[in-house]
């Protein structure tokens, strides 16, 4: 290939001297495997170096398989985290958990021994819970079976179910089926009152101040028995001095219905009169103050209980204990006091039934 001729005065440099193109092209086109092997070796070396560097900074996860016993330093470091018990390997964390469980077990055994000592000291009378005691078991009878059934106080044989644990009711609480009467004419009313339920007590019409319910007797008797008993007491015992009442009779407020007066009985509200100016009690017989009056017996000092008075099956037959006392005193002292009072009877009237 002919080269171009350059002028002499030109400063051009020959390119073949600076860049031998023919030699470079020839080396690239020749098929030799040496440079490829060198390139592969260099790539592998650089990759291994990079992996080693990254391994130091990446955290390693613990393996679940126990390490093998080898003499290398890495294997000895891994064995330090594992504990060998017999033929088994456990980690340090599991070992600490086992220690805590053993401590709790010791505490539980100590508490159980303490409870057993207490039970042995108290004795064998204390039974453990849910333990069946020997002996027959009795069921308590219902409350409705304790009252007798049927009329006239005749109870059926199956009306009472007595259990050994249930306390027996007292006989005083049982209602008496037949009232105690001495008059034969009261036979039919007493039988009717025993078969029918008891009626509530009606308030008395004549006395203004009624005695409390605690002074009444639960066993009903006739009025004739109470009169005979009271007259026998008044004849055998001397009359005691009676004190005046501090509080006058309680009068209801507002309008009240007119009361039916019986001339044969003493009205206690009429016999007690209080002077509003001097606040003294006036005797109904001599119209004198209580201090200067010789009849100091007409005011009761303390309430006396008369069995059977004021409580009867018929409300019209109920008598006040104060009326009974006034009648008895008037009957006994009629011979001692010659004066007469229109409200006090001179003879004992017959009881009307």
Swiss-Prot record:
Membrane topology: Single-pass membrane protein
Positions in coiled-coil regions: none
Residues spanning the membrane: 34-54
Keywords: Membrane, Transmembrane, Transmembrane helix
Keyword NADP: no
Source taxon at top rank: Eukaryota
Biased composition (Basic residues): 244-262
Bias (Low complexity): 182-195, 222-237
Keyword Transmembrane: yes
Region (Disordered) residue spans: 122-271
Biased composition range(s): Polar residues: 211-221
Recorded GO CC terms: membrane
Subcellular compartments: Membrane
Protein family: Belongs to the SPATA31 family.
Full protein name: Putative protein SPATA31J1
Organism name: Homo sapiens
């Amino acid at each position: 290939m002919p080269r171009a001729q350059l002028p002499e005065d030109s400063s051009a440099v020959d390119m073949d001297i600076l860049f031998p193109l023919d030699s470079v092209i020839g080396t690239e086109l020749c098929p030799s495997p040496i440079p490829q092997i060198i390139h592969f070796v260099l790539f592998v070396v650089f990759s291994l170096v990079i992996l080693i560097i990254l391994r130091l900074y990446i955290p390693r996860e613990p393996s679940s398989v126990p390490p093998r016993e080898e003499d290398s330093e890495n294997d000895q470091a891994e064995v330090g985290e594992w504990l060998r018990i017999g033929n088994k390997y456990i980690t340090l964390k599991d070992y600490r958990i086992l220690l805590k469980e053993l401590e709790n077990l010791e505490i539980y055994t100590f508490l159980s021994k303490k409870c057993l000592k207490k039970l042995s000291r108290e004795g064998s009378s204390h039974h453990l819970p849910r333990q069946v005691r020997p002996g027959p078991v009795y069921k308590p009878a219902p409350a409705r079976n304790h009252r007798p059934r049927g009329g006239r106080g005749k109870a059926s044989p199956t009306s009472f179910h007595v259990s050994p644990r249930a306390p027996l009711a007292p006989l005083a609480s049982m209602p008496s089926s037949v009232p105690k009467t001495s008059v034969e004419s009261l036979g039919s009313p007493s039988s009717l009152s025993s078969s029918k339920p008891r009626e509530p007590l009606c308030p008395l019409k004549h006395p203004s101040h009624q005695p409390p319910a605690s002074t009444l007797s639960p066993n009903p008797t006739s009025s004739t028995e109470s009169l005979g008993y009271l007259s026998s007491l008044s004849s055998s015992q001397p009359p005691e001095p009676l004190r005046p009442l501090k509080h006058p009779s309680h009068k209801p407020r507002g309008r009240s219905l007119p009361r039916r007066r019986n001339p044969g009985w003493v009205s206690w509200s009429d016999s007690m009169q209080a002077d509003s100016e001097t606040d003294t009690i006036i005797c109904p017989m001599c119209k004198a103050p209580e201090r200067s009056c010789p009849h100091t017996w007409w005011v009761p000092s303390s309430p006396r209980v008369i069995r059977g008075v004021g409580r009867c099956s018929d409300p019209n037959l109920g008598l006040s204990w104060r009326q009974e006392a006034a009648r008895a005193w008037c009957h006994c002292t009629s011979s001692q006091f010659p004066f007469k009072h229109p409200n006090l009877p001179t003879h004992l009237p017959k009881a009307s039934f």
